[in-house]
From Swiss-Prot:
<feature type="glycosylation site" description="O-linked (GalNAc...) threonine">
    <location>
        <position position="11"/>
    </location>
</feature>
<protein>
    <recommendedName>
        <fullName>Formaecin-1</fullName>
    </recommendedName>
</protein>
<keyword id="KW-0964">Secreted</keyword>
<comment type="function">
    <text>Antibacterial peptide. Has activity against E.coli but none against other Gram-negative bacteria and Gram-positive bacteria.</text>
</comment>
<keyword id="KW-0929">Antimicrobial</keyword>
<dbReference type="InterPro" id="IPR012514">
    <property type="entry name" value="Formaecin"/>
</dbReference>
<dbReference type="GO" id="GO:0042742">
    <property type="term" value="P:defense response to bacterium"/>
</dbReference>
<dbReference type="GO" id="GO:0042381">
    <property type="term" value="P:hemolymph coagulation"/>
</dbReference>
<dbReference type="GO" id="GO:0005576">
    <property type="term" value="C:extracellular region"/>
</dbReference>
<dbReference type="Pfam" id="PF08106">
    <property type="entry name" value="Antimicrobial11"/>
</dbReference>
<keyword id="KW-0325">Glycoprotein</keyword>
<keyword id="KW-0391">Immunity</keyword>
<keyword id="KW-0399">Innate immunity</keyword>
<keyword id="KW-0044">Antibiotic</keyword>
């Protein structure tokens, strides 16, 4: 996936 914003996640966000 690509680095996505917190509010809008088009792809599964990585574990931050």
């Amino acid at each position: 996936g690509r680095p996505n914003p917190v509010n809008n996640k088009p792809t599964p966000h990585p574990r931050l």
